[in-house]
Amino acid sequence: MNGSNLEHRIPALPHLGFGDVLLSHSLASTHYTVLAFLLAVCIPSAPRKSILRYGLLLLQITCALQAFVAPPPPTSDSAVLYTSGVLMANLLARYFDRLYTTVPEESFHRITSTKPESREDATKLPITQRLPWALELFSVTRGIGWNWRVSGIPKSTAPKSRSRFVTAQLLTIIAMYAGLYLVEVTCQGLLASYSSPGTTNANAVQTLAGNLVMYALIVLGLALVVYSHFALFVLPLSILCVGLQVGPVAWRDMSAWPPDYGSLWEAYSLRRFWGITWHQQLRRHTGAPAAYLFSFLPDAVRTSKRRSARLTRRYMLMLITFVISGLIHTSGSYHVSRGLGLPLSYGGEVKYFISQAISIMIEDFGCWLLRIDDRSAGEASTVRRWVGYIVTAGWYFWSRVHWSVMPVALASGIQDERGPLFIALEHTRRSAAAVPGNFAAKAWKITP
């Protein structure tokens, strides 16, 4: 009896096995992502074909992949988890393009002058210069100032002075955060004002108009969120580099910071929307896997001038590029389901991006039947433009909401008995609120 009472009075000692110590100090996916990036920057400085280089490369690949199985960062914000998951896959695709399938210091060159064009030879740089060179290589997304500048970067007229450039960038930051605040509070207002299920206080016309407003808010609001993910770093960095003339030489020029998005005026077809209007941040490394696979084809197939061969190459490249983009975004839903302990989900991003590629193929076929050529700017008639705007916007808004936003919101565990459109609206609100540093929200006494 006394032994039993003594046993209950003595607290249980914690298990301090080696495995428990490792688990208690295990790294999160964020740590592995940072380690993989730092190792990628260091690898080009190691001698080629050396044991050191192979060892660093193996360690870098291990860290990049370990990020997908390590515990997600300790947060319950689904928008933050989604963004970090997309970032991990984005960087992995970047490594595939600029590290795994090439020798970076031999393949990628900074442009030191344009008239005539002169390229920097990174193999001749000392280690003190090659490390910053590699940091720039793995940081840039559109290849501005490099020999691999992506196509479709919007043309813009740079301000006449650095002070005007800095002012314009500061105003853009203010407008961006104010827009995010507006998206957040508008979503809050709509979510609070709409009736609960089972009530009928609006006619069909009012319901349709309300739904169209929500579609527009979801699509345009998330477009601003996507923009903010780039601008959050690019805008302050451009102010620092141009305003104070610091950083890489190419970054100190105002022309090195063109807009991320092209003109909506050019988006009168799906091909032009994705090729001209939408951002080019992923264009290089989403197309890299297809280009790598095509490099194994016989020369006769890769260089054939036959129409069937050219069309096959063109559309296979486009389809694979959209699939890779879908996989990158799918990593966000995968990360959310792991971080929140939800059933494993991959969202609907792959289906959505494949649908865009197939739609472009159908659109191209229709234009071919109607003898319409949209490849050149300025040749489309007024009727062609406005019919194109309506068709493109209608398809894009519907497919974006139903095949991308709704599945991602459901995979994030968002629930609303009023239906999936309200779930998508809540996802939009969370995404806008999750963008860090929103001083506009704080200024208006709104918690972001």
Swiss-Prot record:
<protein>
    <recommendedName>
        <fullName>O-Mevalon transferase yanI</fullName>
        <ecNumber>2.-.-.-</ecNumber>
    </recommendedName>
</protein>
<dbReference type="GO" id="GO:0016114">
    <property type="term" value="P:terpenoid biosynthetic process"/>
</dbReference>
<comment type="similarity">
    <text>Belongs to the wax synthase family.</text>
</comment>
<comment type="function">
    <text>O-Mevalon transferase yanI; part of the gene cluster that mediates the biosynthesis of yanuthone D, a fungal isoprenoid epoxycyclohexenone that acts as an antibiotic against fungi and bacteria. The first step of the pathway is the synthesis of 6-methylsalicylic acid (6-MSA) by the polyketide synthase yanA. 6-MSA is then converted to m-cresol by the decarboxylase yanB. The cytochrome P450 monooxygenase yanC then catalyzes the oxidation of m-cresol to toluquinol.</text>
</comment>
<feature type="transmembrane region" description="Helical">
    <location>
        <begin position="217"/>
        <end position="237"/>
    </location>
</feature>
<dbReference type="InterPro" id="IPR032805">
    <property type="entry name" value="Wax_synthase_dom"/>
</dbReference>
<keyword id="KW-0808">Transferase</keyword>
<dbReference type="GO" id="GO:0016020">
    <property type="term" value="C:membrane"/>
</dbReference>
<keyword id="KW-0325">Glycoprotein</keyword>
<feature type="transmembrane region" description="Helical">
    <location>
        <begin position="21"/>
        <end position="41"/>
    </location>
</feature>
<feature type="transmembrane region" description="Helical">
    <location>
        <begin position="390"/>
        <end position="410"/>
    </location>
</feature>
<feature type="transmembrane region" description="Helical">
    <location>
        <begin position="79"/>
        <end position="96"/>
    </location>
</feature>
<feature type="transmembrane region" description="Helical">
    <location>
        <begin position="350"/>
        <end position="370"/>
    </location>
</feature>
<keyword id="KW-0812">Transmembrane</keyword>
<feature type="transmembrane region" description="Helical">
    <location>
        <begin position="165"/>
        <end position="185"/>
    </location>
</feature>
<dbReference type="GO" id="GO:0008374">
    <property type="term" value="F:O-acyltransferase activity"/>
</dbReference>
<comment type="pathway">
    <text>Secondary metabolite biosynthesis; terpenoid biosynthesis.</text>
</comment>
<dbReference type="Pfam" id="PF13813">
    <property type="entry name" value="MBOAT_2"/>
</dbReference>
<feature type="transmembrane region" description="Helical">
    <location>
        <begin position="54"/>
        <end position="74"/>
    </location>
</feature>
<dbReference type="InterPro" id="IPR044851">
    <property type="entry name" value="Wax_synthase"/>
</dbReference>
<feature type="transmembrane region" description="Helical">
    <location>
        <begin position="316"/>
        <end position="336"/>
    </location>
</feature>
<feature type="glycosylation site" description="N-linked (GlcNAc...) asparagine">
    <location>
        <position position="2"/>
    </location>
</feature>
<keyword id="KW-1133">Transmembrane helix</keyword>
<keyword id="KW-0472">Membrane</keyword>
